[in-house]
Amino acid sequence: MRHRAPDWAFLLASSDAPAPPPVPMGLRIRAAVHTARAMRILQKHGWGPAHRYLQQLRPVPGSDRYAALPPPTAIRLARQEILWSQLVRRILEPDGLCLARSFSLAVYLSALGLPCEVTVARELVANNPEFGFHSWAELYGEVLNDAPVVQRGFRVLQRVSADDTAARRAAGTQIDMATD
């Protein structure tokens, strides 16, 4: 049986990249469990322990095929999976601001083997002192959950990603993945 994309799938395409392979529900659930754990850590213990959780995160078993995707296809997959990561975030932290949104997306995509990173930045010209900092998620330098121009108005303070995922992508090698 041939997999048919929904009629609205063109809205999620970031380029003319080929369609990524579908993500089985079992992998989505495992990635969502990691996202829920990470969100609880962020809520209860703050950014320090939460960003260490992301750095130490290992992709879930079965995610090798997504880690090997070329960047345009991986970005397209990431855009298609945003709903799942944000569903977990909306359940656990309905009023979560940019850090919670970006963090949940980065954890979810990293669990799928994509080298997504959370970017924390300071506004260059503060219009509102209450919101002088901002956060977004990036994959291969492309902003996933904000306007692409956000990179121009902020000075990056910190970029956090899953060390194993980023190292594997940089080295172009496969690393054995730990199971939970």
Predicted feature residues:
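A short, contiguous structural element within a folded domain that forms the immediate neighborhood
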Residues: L77-W84
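Short coil/turn segments at secondary-structure boundaries
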Residues: P72, E93-G96
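Long amphipathic N-terminal alpha/beta scaffold segment
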Residues: A68-L69, I75, L105, L112
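N-terminal accessory/pre-domain segments preceding catalytic cores
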Residues: M1-A67, W84-P94, A111-L112, V120, ...
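Hydrophobic/aromatic-rich core segments of domains that either
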Residues: W84, F103-D180
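A generic helix-loop boundary/linker signal
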Residues: A74-I75, N127
